[in-house]
Amino acid sequence: MTLTRLEQLLEFYKEDPSDAYTIYALATEYLKIDTRKSKEYYEMLLAEHPNYVGTYYHAAKLYDELGQKDEAEKVYKKGMQISRQEGNMHAFSELQQAYNKFMGLDYEDE
């Protein structure tokens, strides 16, 4: 029997529940089928692996989609702060663009 991607990730998680990449992959995989579980894994990353910069964009976007606007704004801001501290300017730029769009500040030239 072949394991599904989710089953494989859950096995990896059992082997090493502190691995940030596995937690991130689980959050992403659950996003397709169970946003509540996805949110739990993103929140785990935010709490236990605050320097895992990739989390912030997706977690903030999920909060926004769930109507949790205040939480989305906090996560975008924290992500920009962390990515700048880490010197990850690519992530900072992506977060800043997403934040500006979220805030309605993504002006287009007409």
Each language-model region and where it sits:
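Alpha-helical linker/edge segments of TPR/alpha-solenoid repeat scaffolds
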Residues: 2, 71-74, 98-110
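Residue at a conserved register position within TPR or TPR-like alpha-solenoid repeats
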Residues: 29-30, 63, 83, 103
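Structural marker of alpha-solenoid helical repeat scaffolds
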Residues: 15, 48-49, 65, 82-86
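Structural motif corresponding to the intra-repeat A-B loop/turn of tetratricopeptide repeats
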Residues: 32-33, 66, 86, 106
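Structural register within alpha-helical repeat arrays
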Residues: 25-26, 59, 99
